[in-house]
């Protein structure tokens, strides 16, 4: 509050004294945001090929296994954890191209790469299964973690794709203790030049 009781805007003050009005020129902030946007091309074992995909910090914390094929704490995700320490949004690009998808007689991995070799399919009899109408419980495992389960399925065509595998279009379900997906390979890193 200025001397004389008020802020000086116009010459209308009745009290004697010196009135001063300081106005600063607007200037750009020198502080940088610690939560911006970044881009990171990487050689990855899982994920879409040939496209840029965007991941938010909240998605990375919650769904890193679905997006990158590994749990948040896995050593394979250290570069991702480091960039998300100061970024809110990251655009990723998978450098390795022309990889092969792991597969078995029931399913094919969603993405090419050697991480698909850690997927396993387990087919068990459903508790409501009868001799006339066989029903199955089909589970998808990534390593030792169950990532999907579909219960009371009569045929392979009744299975819905999940975040890890696309199911075969034909064939018969049969009891299987565990059937790994095999043949997944990372492609080579392409030179952009």
Predicted segment positions?
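Surface-exposed assembly/interface segments
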Residues: 1-193
